[in-house]
């Protein structure tokens, strides 16, 4: 009788398209006593944990808790559901509960648990799961081993990932793909390319995902030579310059190639390929707009943005970040306000990354009031958001406003400043000549928050003291600090010498920095400028001859804070 009832219900479950329908079927199961049968219940949980239209993990959990002895299949359904959810930590809780109640995981359980570990970057839990995988003999399973490899790579443990890869019985395209993707995500681009070559020598053909990862690698390390080789490789597989192959147009590969050329600075080829695309996605538009923006061609980036809007394509977060960057390059506050107004209409103004970009844009264009207003509109202000606005204001000449924001951050108490926050604060103090305040903040780092100053923090303090002409304190700090002085430290001292015409200290620094070429051209230039102002032309000549003989090129210098933006 029960079997007679649940077969039609199973059939109806297959056709279920909404949570309302699922609730109705659940009620029918209770009414017809089918609720006691584990088969329809397991299917009900499946629909609550896998189907987008009926996804409801709370509902699935209530059904799960009504089952006296859930099977491993049902445990797996719950773990899978949570591993794919915004709360993957609950998948680990279910896994632990499963073990506690004496159930034995199978080769479906481990991949779901390892996926949760990957999402959480929980290497400690993942290592424990690895141990249990070995204990139960599932390390020989290809699917489980590949998930272990992926987990270690996601957690940044590349060497452990390599060991897992080497122990995989048979290296198929999925295993190679996980290895190459792991290398790329951990910025080991040459290793990714070498792995591809080894894969080819093993007779395994690359799939679309692998080719995309390799193009990403070439773009990130700006290796256009290898990128062009991969472009030719794709053409050898049947793709012409317009990506039309025997199986049709591949928009993903096309976009990846455009992105690679743009990141390598070859905008001409990137645009040629973009114009030749028979169809474009938002990602395609973002690639070309971002390419122009990152390469300093703000006008073309904004033109492409307007073209995209004319075609009725709605921008996303990536689009806005690129356009805001382009507006910042243009240095026009009015243009920035227009973009800000458009961002507000779309609802992206609540996104922390976009608000931080707007703040930096306004700060750079000299509009400190608009920068502060944009920041005020952000509902949730975490440490990163506070830090970005502080550094944005400080690095663009609005030191007092930066310190005012920092004071509010401390008063609110809902975010704790970190080392980068204090770098912005010290930079602000340096540029408005607040010596005592700078010393107080420098001490506060360690005393209140347990933050050990880095060479960048020491550089800011040396700059503060040197600008104020307090050279004895600056020298004492350089001699007693626990880190080796770098170009920023010596540069800060020499900058103070330049301001206050301190030739005695300049000579001492020149003798202390035995090989200034190791620190770059900036030290040479500062020394030369100081001696030129003092009319010591013989010293200027010696320095310039030294630069020429040692082939030191004159380049523009930037502070450690300025290079962050």
UniProtKB/Swiss-Prot annotation:
Gene3D superfamilies: Tetratricopeptide repeat domain. Keywords: Repeat. Residues 489-564 are annotated as: Type E motif. InterPro entries: E_motif (IPR046848), Pentatricopeptide_rpt (IPR002885), PPR_At4g14850-like_plant (IPR046960), TPR-like_helical_dom_sf (IPR011990). The keyword ATP-binding does not apply. One of its GO terms (cellular component) is mitochondrion. The keyword Protein transport does not apply. GO terms for biological process: mitochondrial mRNA modification. PPR repeats lie at residues 37-70, 71-105, 106-140, 141-171, 172-206, 207-241, 250-280, 281-315, 316-350, 351-381, 382-416, 418-448, 454-484. It comes from the Eukaryota. GO terms for molecular function: RNA binding. Pfam families: E_motif (PF20431), PPR (PF01535), PPR_2 (PF13041). Belongs to the PPR family. PCMP-E subfamily. NCBIfam families: PPR. This is Putative pentatricopeptide repeat-containing protein At3g05240. It comes from Arabidopsis thaliana (Mouse-ear cress). The gene is PCMP-E82.
